[in-house]
Every structure is written in C-alpha cells, then in structure tokens.
C-alpha cells in the first residue's frame, strides 16, 4: 500500500492555514495507481451480492463509478441540493462551522438492495453519517462504506452509525 500512499500529494495550508490537504488527484492521474486502487477495493466485494454503489459528491463519484463498473452494478449519486432532477429526500447535517445538506432520489433503491457507499476520504464522518441515513431511509442495506483514505486522527469512524467501514489507506 505504500506505493499508493506515496502517490498522494500533501498540500500544506489548504484550504486554510494549519490544514494539510491530502490531494488524491495525483493518484487519479496515474493510471497504474488508479487501477490498483480500484482493484484492491473492488476485490473486497467480489462474490458478495451488491446491488448498487452509492457515490458521494463529488470525488466519491470517481471511486463509485469505477467500483460499479468493476463489480457490474449501477451507481446511485448523493448530491448537494438542487442537482438531482427527480423527487428527492434530504438530510441536513452539522459541519465544524455550520450545516450542509445532501439529497438522493427517493426511488434510488428497491427494498432490501445491498449497497456499498464510496467516497474518497473519511475525515470527521459527518458527510457519510448523513449518507447512511439517506440510504437507510430509502430502504437499502449498507454492506460497507469504502474509502480510498482515512484521516484517523479525526476519529470519523466513531461518528458513523455502522461498524462496516473500510479504508484502503490510513493517515
């Protein structure tokens, strides 16, 4: 895994002073690293009944679409308000300074669908906790939440309402 870890670039003081941003665009741009990442994560779910991948706006769309293709499933998008054209359900959640809202199509899943939630990074866990509530409200079962990377010092895993969490890389 060290090969993938070394491809991710650290950007100091972004988006604000004191933050070291994990820039995954370098991994996404490197074909060998990108394919290896997708293969390693997808391998966890081969042979399991997975009906959909849930991609979280915006970088979760990249990982989610690649996993869906590799596993032969569709992808369901969770977006910011006003981006989905059909009837939606929303979840507002707390950020460090304020709130944010996500939404999903109300008919995104069939009852009992088994899904994997995909996102690039697990930080504080607030976003994915909201996504988990949306998925459950739509009648689907979360098999696991899959991340390219996790910032362990932020303890986001502890905020999630489920114990099935996988992170390929941990920082």
Curated annotation (Swiss-Prot):
Which EC number(s) are documented for this chain?
2.4.2.7
* The species this protein was found in: Syntrophotalea carbinolica (strain DSM 2380 / NBRC 103641 / GraBd1)
PANTHER family noted in UniProt: ADENINE PHOSPHORIBOSYLTRANSFERASE (PTHR32315:SF3)
For this UniProt record, the keywords arranged alphabetically read as follows: Cytoplasm, Glycosyltransferase, Purine salvage, Transferase
As one GO molecular function, the record gives: adenine binding
The pathway that the record names for this protein is: Purine metabolism; AMP biosynthesis via salvage pathway; AMP from adenine: step 1/1
Pfam families in the cross-refs: Pribosyltran (PF00156)
Q: Which superkingdom, per the lineage? A: Bacteria
What interactions and quaternary structure are annotated?
Homodimer.
From the UniProt record, give one GO term of the biological process aspect.
Answer: adenine salvage
Catalytic activity from the UniProt record: AMP + diphosphate = 5-phospho-alpha-D-ribose 1-diphosphate + adenine
- In the record, what lineage is assigned to the organism producing the protein? Bacteria, Pseudomonadati, Thermodesulfobacteriota, Desulfuromonadia, Desulfuromonadales
Q: What class of enzyme is it?
A: transferase
| Any single GO CC term annotated in Swiss-Prot or TrEMBL for this entry | cytoplasm
Can you say what this protein is called?
Adenine phosphoribosyltransferase
Q: Please report which protein family the annotation says this sequence is part of.
A: Belongs to the purine/pyrimidine phosphoribosyltransferase family.
């Amino acid at each position: 895994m060290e090969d993938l870890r070394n491809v991710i670039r650290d950007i100091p003081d972004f988006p604000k002073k004191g933050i070291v941003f994990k820039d995954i665009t370098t991994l996404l741009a490197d074909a060998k690293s990108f394919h290896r990442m997708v293969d390693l994560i997808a391998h966890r779910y081969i042979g399991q009944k997975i009906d959909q991948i849930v991609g979280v706006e915006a970088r979760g769309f990249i990982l989610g679409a690649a996993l869906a293709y590799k596993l032969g499933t569709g992808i369901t998008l969770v977006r910011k308000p006003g981006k989905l054209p059909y009837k939606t359900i929303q979840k507002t959640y707390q950020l460090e300074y304020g709130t944010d809202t996500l939404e999903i199509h109300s008919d995104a899943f069939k009852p009992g669908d088994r899904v994997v939630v995909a996102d690039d990074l697990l930080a504080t866990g607030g976003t994915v906790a909201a996504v988990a509530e949306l998925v459950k409200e739509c009648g689907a079962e979360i098999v696991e939440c899959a991340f390219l990377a996790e910032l362990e010092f932020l303890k986001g895993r502890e905020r999630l309402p489920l114990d099935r969490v996988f992170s390929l890389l941990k920082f």
